[in-house]
């Protein structure tokens, strides 16, 4: 993603057999508020200092982010989140070798993310995202839905040379908006679901995402099923309603 207007100096360095770089990037952009949807002005400042040595097959670029546009993160998380916007603050480094690049550091995100599997937007802020070799670690990250309900996200994104991303996320839901479909979909139902329970999402680039939910709907949840269309009447075997007691018996039979 764009980082802004850059003023960067690059020069040949005999000692490292490569190019040393130093500079500053300033970006003026707008970010929607997660609760109100109103856009606000953000000034992002990013500093870079380091070197690139093709002769040594190595790189070391230290990057200082301060309200830096988070759209660049979408390239790493695009397989699981369809939208990423906001900003990040904290020191990170791009390190080599050049044929096995990593991004390491600790960044505090203030980001809006839309989960690809459910199309529900969430917001994270204030916690620290740990970037480690071959790993982006989301540990005890507070996430919020657009109503301000809070839950906890844990997960990891792994990669090789900033490619072949794999995702594994686990969310402990506490009255969080877990599903929000306002028009009848191909399965002839729509729903707004606030839930308690657990949600896991896993997958990898170029492959389907797998979603496993063990949840209980809470206050405010709505479910509507269109049984009026001919194909719904003949093809509604995908849904079965049970009372609470029979559901408990059903689960107890699972080995």
Model-derived segments and their meaning:
Residues 1-137, 154-255:
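Membrane-proximal interfacial segments on either side of biological membranes
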